[in-house]
Amino acid sequence: MNNLIFIWNTIYGGIVMNNNINILDELNKGCYMGIDALDIVLKKIEDPDFKELLEDQHEEYVELTNRIDELYRTYSDKEPHETSAMLKAMTWYGIQKDTILDDSISKIADLLINGTNMGIIEGRKLLNNKKMDKKVHKLCCDYTKMQENYIEKLKKFL
């Protein structure tokens, strides 16, 4: 009986550990998507209030990536996944294409809301995964709540 419990704990523990790594990887990629997009649009912004909001959001993404890095080290000796060069190029191209005729604050806020909504959806899907450690769950909640808060702030600029 003890052997069965050991085997079950070993298998289940491995599943949870892999889930934690996968969830942290997805959160990190989501943060870097936000960082990459904000790096691009910040160059287009002159309005001081809008710029300050985006800089604050950028900083929160950076803080989250630092927390992800720290927690990731408890599960793996590798680095968490970031966005690929191809995805960065596609992000840059998409923003340039969508703002070539209209680079107003309203248009950029709209683009950022749409991108942030994708992050919220991914965060909510990850939260529905019940097999994660409490610290990973908290980080996932913080990621999702941060994005939900910024959507509300971005709406003022539509």
Q: Which residues does each predicted region cover?
A:
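Short, Lys/Arg-enriched N-terminal segments with co-localized hydrophobic residues
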Residues: M1-V16
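Alpha-helical bundle segments that constitute or directly flank the non-heme di-iron/ferroxidase center
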Residues: M17-I45, K107-K131
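Long, non-catalytic architectural segments outside compact domain cores
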Residues: N19, L53-E63, Y93-Q96, L101
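Short, charged, amphipathic alpha-helical segments
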Residues: D25, K51-E59, T83, L87, ...
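A structural signal for well-ordered alpha-helices, especially hydrophobic packing surfaces
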Residues: I35, T65, D69-Y72, Y93, ...
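Acidic (E/D-rich), amphipathic helical modules within compact regulatory domains
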Residues: P48-K78
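Carboxylate-rich helix-loop segments that flank metal/cofactor sites and access channels
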Residues: N66, E70-M118
